[in-house]
């Protein structure tokens, strides 16, 4: 199926100069960062990987965050995805933060449940964003309510909000890509086609169908044993919904990797290229290890990003990861899995690479 955004792969190959600097031993700044503006969430999804963070009612200080965004943009950060431990739109200054991100020269995106993406917010942010991806894990309100553990009416609210977002984008000539995402579970597998049709009909650009991934620290493990080998044929059914303007991105490669549980790399090499900021201002090397001091770099309330990124804590963390961390003990299909596969191959090329 069409995946022009390379969602089932990676895009680091487009950042040749940054990769080359890393290969040359430079202390590069990240290309991408995930930021959690809010620790609170208005849903309690059955599959939530960050439930161990306990949906704390904490929010990043807007002034400090925007100061750091200006700094990070100047240092070379290319993109930010607002998502994290909670629902980003619960942050009262999210509109202002998104617009400041763009002014800082950083591409911004958001993963959201979209219940709070009303017309006013959509009007205020669509012109400043590269993409918005909605987590909507069912094709009917009943199943949606059961999985998101919220009121069934939220389903129609989300559909209405995204329909309005499409209209606002068209009326204003905005370029923001609008998509949806379903995490394929036993409870919703029979509604993937229903959601695909609905997403296409309201004007979404794509629907991602992705596999579950067990977070190492998550309190929920009800889907730990789920396999996708008997669901792969669903790709053929969903392909029928593709048009010139809409595509279903069925993450076949990632599903197979989940079932196999294997990696082709013996070390995590991706950490210099990305970072995670939690809702308390903490900077981490990996979102799969939130709370593990070995991955903690510092806090934006205490230090500038430059001080954190070039600081002793981060250097010790990178050294430990390089020498001791075994990726086989990490989360399967982690955020940086495809990046690691790519970098491992660059570091250990096969024979005959000069015969291009």
Describe the residue ranges of each PLM region.
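Hydrophobic packing within well-folded, soluble alpha/beta domains
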Residues: 41, 45-48, 97, 101, ...
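Residue-level recognition of short loop/turn positions
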Residues: 44, 85, 112, 279-280
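Active-site-flanking alpha-helical
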Residues: 50, 94, 286-287
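Short, contiguous clusters of charged residues that form electrostatic/catalytic patches at enzyme active sites
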Residues: 17, 63, 67, 96, ...
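Residues that line or immediately flank small-molecule/substrate-binding pockets and catalytic motifs
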Residues: 52, 84, 136, 211, ...
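Radical SAM enzyme [4Fe-4S]-AdoMet core and its adjacent flexible, acidic
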Residues: 1-7, 36, 60, 74, ...
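N-terminal pre-core extensions flanking Radical SAM catalytic domains
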Residues: 1-56, 70-73, 255-263, 272-274, ...
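Conserved Radical SAM active-site core
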Residues: 54-111, 115-128
């Amino acid at each position: 199926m069409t995946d022009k955004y390379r969602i089932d792969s990676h895009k680091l190959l487009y950042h040749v100069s940054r990769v080359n600097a890393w290969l040359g031993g430079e202390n590069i700044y990240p290309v991408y960062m995930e930021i959690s503006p809010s620790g609170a969430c208005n849903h309690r999804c059955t599959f939530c990987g960050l439930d161990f963070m306990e949906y704390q009612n904490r929010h990043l200080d807007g002034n400090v965050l925007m100061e750091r965004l200006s700094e990070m943009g100047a240092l070379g950060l290319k993109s930010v995805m607002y998502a994290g431990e909670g629902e980003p739109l619960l942050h009262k200054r999210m509109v202002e933060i998104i617009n400041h991100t763009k002014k800082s020269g950083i591409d911004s995106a958001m993963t959201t449940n979209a219940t709070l993406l009303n017309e006013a917010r959509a009007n205020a942010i669509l012109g400043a964003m590269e993409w918005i991806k909605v987590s909507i894990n069912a094709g009917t309100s009943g199943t949606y309510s059961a999985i998101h553990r919220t009121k069934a009416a939220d389903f129609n609210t989300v559909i209405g909000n995204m329909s309005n977002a499409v209209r606002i984008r068209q009326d204003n000539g905005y370029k923001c890509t609008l998509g949806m995402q379903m995490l394929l579970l036993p409870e919703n597998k029979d509604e993937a086609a229903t959601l695909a049709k609905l997403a296409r009909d309201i004007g979404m650009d794509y629907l991602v169908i992705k596999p579950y991934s067990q977070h190492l620290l998550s309190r929920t493990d009800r889907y730990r044993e789920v396999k996708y080998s008997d669901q792969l044929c669903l790709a053929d059914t969903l392909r029928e919904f593709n048009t010139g303007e809409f595509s279903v991105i069925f993450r076949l490669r990632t599903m197979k990797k989940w079932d196999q549980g294997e990696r082709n790399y013996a070390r995590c090499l991706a950490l210099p290229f990305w970072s995670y900021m939690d809702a308390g201002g903490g900077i981490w090397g990996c979102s799969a290890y939130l709370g593990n001091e070995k991955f903690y770099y510092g806090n934006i309330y205490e230090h500038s990003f430059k001080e954190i990124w070039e600081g002793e804590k981060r250097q010790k963390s990178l050294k430990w990861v390089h020498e001791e961390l075994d990726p086989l003990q990490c989360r399967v299909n982690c955020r940086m899995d495809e990046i690691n596969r790519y970098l491992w191959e660059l570091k250990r090329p096969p024979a005959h690479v000069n015969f291009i």
